[in-house]
Amino acid sequence: MVADFKDIKKEDVSVAGGKGANLGEMTREKINVPAGFIVTTEAYKEFLRVNKITDIINNELNKAGNDEKSILNAACYFRKRIRSGTFPAALKNLIGEKYNALGENKKVAIRSSATAEDLADASFAGQQDSYLNIQGMDEILEHIRSCYASLWTDRAVSYRFRQGYDQSRVSIAVIVQEMVESEKSGVLFTVAPINKNENAMLINAAFGLGESVVSGRVSADTYMIDKKTGMIQINIGNKETQIVYDKKGTVERVLSDDKRK
């Protein structure tokens, strides 16, 4: 129910979700990846089973049929049940062992990794929640539970509904990964995402933690790179804020004028 990155490969999406499978593959390729582990989809299923939520989800989805409003109403109930659920002792112990192996009271990111991410015909990335700068077992378990609940947010459910994805098939893993105190962060697309140009890469970057870029909260800088020539097109965004560490997670702060452009 809990796996090290090195034991996961890119084909293991059903076990580790999209992000988890990619982190595992990068680790196997000796790429420098911040340390961590994956609470697998089996752990999510066991959590649902122990808290008697599995049958509730199946029954309510069957009742809702293909009516979006009914599915959303059911999902609201699923979230409440998940948030009030408890972790089985064996799973809690496994998570605790892996967390302690990272170092004493390490600050970590708790990252959702759903099985419906990065499909060929739809992008589910960003539909589930992730949390930064989390510390201590109680907080980790609380935020894993929040990741589980985020599988059933209105946004995630509606997106799956409109993509024609079977709600009963979706599952989620959670990544627990050591935090990196980044002054600047970004996202790299190895294929230009708008025009699907395989000869170009796109980087979106901003100051602070990557949450501001991923969430679209800031107008990030963009760098378009031609793979063949190395030529770069740069567009500097008006970055008004940045997300940085806080004692209890993260906080959004105004960026100084000299860094905005």
Where are these regions (language model features)?
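N-terminal beta-alpha lobe that positions the nucleotide/phosphoryl donor
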Residues: 1-175, 184, 255-258
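Short, flexible loop/turn elements at secondary-structure junctions
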Residues: 114, 178-180, 207
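Short, glycine/charged-enriched secondary-structure capping and boundary segments
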Residues: 123-125, 190, 203
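Short beta-strand-to-turn element immediately C-terminal to the catalytic PLP-Schiff-base lysine
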Residues: 131-135, 189-192, 224-226
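Conserved catalytic alpha/beta cores of large enzymes that bind or transform nucleotide phosphates
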Residues: 200-261
